[in-house]
Amino acid sequence: MNVDCIGPWTVTANNGAKYTFSALTCIDPVTNLVDIILLDGSNPRADYCGERFEICWLSRYPKPNRCVYDNGNEFLGRGFQEILAKHKIQGKATTVKNAQANGICERMHQTMLNVLKVHAKTTTIDDYNGARHVMEHAIASCIHATRIAVNHTMQHTPGEIVFQRDMLLDIPVIADLVAIRERRQLLIDEN
């Protein structure tokens, strides 16, 4: 499991009011399944991030053995660390020497930023609820896009691997996880 915070983004309503949001991104590095959790405000606290991680990821998906995160206070703080300890998940902060260890999250953030820009420019926003609505729709679009994108290494979409169904057509998909693991290792060895 890789987690990271993205944002803050300021959404401006028609009346000039500004609303700030950020998000918690969660990616399973085995399947590349993504979930994105909307957070209020620009500087989320560790207890808030931990609570949202527990409610939005741990309540829906199998418990990960390990959680990789950067050195931000939202992950190193007591609240987030308590959630990891409660669920017996090994926390692993990236180091200065290996800052790219959480690169899987960082690459997805650029996709999300592009989606958010389009939604913010093409939607009328009147108030906080409208701003939140834009953010939720942009996040849903980004989640869907990442789940239906064919991964070069896996030769399947993350949605196909996790749900064993095509994400667009109503047909079953059987992915050979052993072959995927071997293909990944081969690519690593070649580089």
Residue ranges with predicted function:
Residues F80-N191:
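Domain-scale segment recognizer with a strong primary affinity
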Residues W9-T10, L33, P44-A46, E74-G77, ...:
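Flexible loop/turn segments at secondary-structure boundaries
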Residues P62-L76, G91, T95, N102:
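Acidic/histidine-rich, metal-coordinating catalytic segments
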Residues N2, T25-C26, I36-L38, V68, ...:
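Structured core elements
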Residues T31-D35, S59-R66:
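Short, surface-exposed connector motifs at secondary-structure boundaries
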Residues V34, Y48-F53, V68, G77-F80, ...:
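Extended, hydrophobic alpha-helical segments in both membrane/secreted and soluble proteins
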Residues M1-D35, D40-G41:
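An active-site-proximal beta-strand-loop segment
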Residues Y19, I36-R60:
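Active-site beta-loop-alpha junctions of metal-dependent nucleic acid enzymes
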